Amino acid sequence: MTKYFRHFWWAWPFLALKIFIFYWQTDRLDMMNVYEVPVLTVLFLFGLFEICSMGRGKASRWIFYICYTVITLVMFADAAYSSYFGRYISVNQIYQLTSLGQIAGDGNVIGAAVSPGCVLTLIDYPFVLYFYRLRQKGGEALATMSMRRFVPYVGVHALLLLAMVCVWYYYGCNPYNLRSVQKVNHIEFFTYHTNDILVNVLGRLRRGEVDEDAILKTMEELVPRSSGKEYKGVAKGKNLILIQTESLNDFVIGAEYNGQELTPNLNALLKEDTFYFNHFYSTTGVGNTSDAEFAALNGLYPNDVRECYRLYVDNTFQGLPWILRGEGYGAYAFHGYTKTFWNREEAYKTQGFQHFYSQEELTMTEVSGFGLTDKEMFRQAVDILKEKPQPFFSFIITLTNHIPYELDPSLASLVLRPEDEGTTFGGYLQTIRYTDEAFGKLIEYLKEAGLYEDTMIVIYGDHQGMNMETPSVKSSMSRFLGKEYNFDEMLNVPLIIHIPGLGEAETIDTVGGQVDILPTIMNLMDVEPGHPFIFGHDLLNADEGFVAQISYIGKGSFITGDNNMLFAIGKDGTVESGSVWDLRNGEKMNRNNALCQQYSDRATALLDTCKEVLDYNLIAEYVTH
């Protein structure tokens, strides 16, 4: 028996090390004051080891091997996902493996996005399996135990199993819907994934009826409002080119580096016939780039379940492509990568695009990094568009400024400082400069094709390019900005609306997000959506600015212009452990819990209500295609 327990103690340090590394790599060590978290993880992990050790046969051994392998892989996935998105992975993300597989060939993409420290979650694996085998061999079989030893041995293990089941049910299932339990479920590994499966798998099976009137009432109360008709129809009848720019952060606009303008062409654009929104924020869900598209095209929030291009591929939509087709426009999409990425090939059909030009159809004359270079994309797009009947709507997604920001040296024009050579930060500035040059070329191509004067150009960033969760990036960015780099800068992407002949240039500081692009464009083009389910508002006539957040800082986070603050909810899902930044100077603010709770509830309700609209395909009741 002494030998039996000795093998258990040998395994203990490695199990404890696994728990420590996991919560360290997912940045949750500071939440261990919620005592249930370490207690529950220890109970489940040590309990699994102990109970499986009771058996002496191959079945027990393989049950443990399989269970521990799954736990280890999920912990690794959680650590990797959290290092970029700040949250654990969900069962819904299993569907993203197809997209991951498409970019896995470029290890630099994944390497730049994921913290190398995640590999440490695997370090215990061979040792625990080895000591488990010794434990199993060194123990006494139940059949040979005396009754005096058998009864307490089995009794203790039965109580351990009962405790595991009861605790798992209470915390993982949360039958009484307690807030204190929800807090634990945001942090603790086993109960988070139990709750995630229950909510996202079983929850769909229990879906009931929807109250459309209640949804419309909620929208009336919570969706930010716009009043007035300023600039209505100033772009009516014009062609529309909507450009989603990969990883374009707002901090590069007007900035200089090493005595060089980072975005000279965009800077020039802002001086004439342009609206520039400098407090504009990404509203991506778990679909990241594809969800940015979804929000911009439809005025709908993505969600934290799954990328909308897959989850709602069979829904009926009435976004920009369908609205403008109803006005006699042609609708075309361009992307210099494979057409199946993010399920675009299928999703674009329901979005209303008549043709999707991807790498399978474009000429891959110049490739750098992730796909067709931006200059070549713009050149080929204009060549195609000038042959199309007018007016047209063109949606273009750029690619050159994609992580890991590796630009062919022949295309690089920015002179980097020695300390920034070979870094993610330096690479980002280099590709940003190239993308800006591409915008200059786009204007030239449009003028040469005779399209410029009759075309409204809308440019926005899809999501952050510099992830503050990466220590080296945060350090470089803080040095560049002259202040600590935080979420207020990271989530800030530009929105630029250029209308030749507008006759004015204005910087607008109204807080907005990608859900506001559709209603803002509708006002400028004087068109209507034909349904009431628009969750954004016209930023040119906004009464207030409010944006709900999903990814990176978590559901329940928000950005509001009324109080000039960005609020990031705590990783335990509570307002009390959240953080607040002042949008005016980027400094941390004292948290007003009551006010933050009010806004947080509003943000959550907006996301939940929008999800109901999508889950029940309510737009289909208003339109037919």
Tell where the protein language model's regions lie, with residue ranges.
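Transmembrane and membrane-interface helices of multi-pass
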Residues: 2-197
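A diffuse structural propensity rather than consistent per-protein peaks
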Residues: 80-93, 111-115, 198, 202-212, ...
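Hydrophobic residues in alpha-helical segments
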Residues: 83, 104, 191, 205, ...
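Generic N-terminal initiation segments characterized by hydrophobic and/or small/turn-forming residues
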Residues: 139-147, 175, 195, 199-202, ...
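Membrane-interface segments at or immediately adjacent to transmembrane helices
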Residues: 164-237, 243
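Solvent-exposed soluble domains appended to multi-pass membrane proteins
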Residues: 217-625
